[in-house]
């Protein structure tokens, strides 16, 4: 046996998160030198990561976080739900959010090249490789977003299904509308709107919807067809547009009415500037 103690073996395992067998192999290869063993394991991780890159990654988590300057959003995928709930993997994702907020990056490439806050001696992509060795699965950073914080604004975050679906809402007109912003984010996850408002629906989407409706009511007088099309189009807007949808917590209120009521009560002029809905693999 090489000249290293159980305490050194334990320290190496704690520092790297790698299994005892690999840690022992590293210490034996490096003559018991802890620092060299860490480097050995990192190189081993980078090498073994390449062998896993081709594996499918259909599971994972979506996570979001805000600070005083902005909001970070990320999707990271792995092979199995078991690893998606692994503490090491979740810590890795949590630190990725910190990196996005620190560097204000909004692409996978920019994030991957940045120095990791979890281990500044490694880039994010190098740490991804080391983490792949630890959890034994391919890890893929699928998408990244960063939203700078606007003046007098509030961001709401709602996560569902242990990170399988996440919604963000950006409200203008108030910096203290946290409860409202989170309620609307929760509503977005439940109702899954396609558009913010009627005005934001593309003309081609409206034209396509009219074609579908018209094909269902052929043979009726033109004035009747026009009334039916108008009615069905309004139903389409109520289903597809966030501001038109009935609030999930109180169907008597539309989301627009909910915002109007808050604005009157708070004396502010609140509006939804943007909403984002991410689902794993979508």
Swiss-Prot record:
Highest classification ranks of the organism: Bacteria, Pseudomonadati, Chlamydiota, Chlamydiia, Chlamydiales
InterPro entries: EF-Ts_dimer_sf, Transl_elong_EFTs/EF1B, Transl_elong_EFTs/EF1B_dimer, Transl_elong_Ts_CS, UBA-like_sf
Gene symbol of the encoding locus: tsf
HAMAP family named in the record: EF_Ts
CDD domains in the cross-refs: UBA_EF-Ts (cd14275)
Primary location: cytoplasm
Entry GO CC: cytoplasm
Gene Ontology molecular functions: translation elongation factor activity
Function summary: Associates with the EF-Tu.GDP complex and induces the exchange of GDP to GTP. It remains bound to the aminoacyl-tRNA.EF-Tu.GTP complex up to the GTP hydrolysis stage on the ribosome.
NCBIfam families: tsf
Record region (Involved in Mg(2+) ion dislocation from EF-Tu): 80-83
Keywords: Cytoplasm, Elongation factor, Protein biosynthesis
Coiled coil stretches, renumbered: none
UniProt-recorded name of the protein: Elongation factor Ts
Entry's localization field: Cytoplasm
Protein family according to the UniProt entry: Belongs to the EF-Ts family.
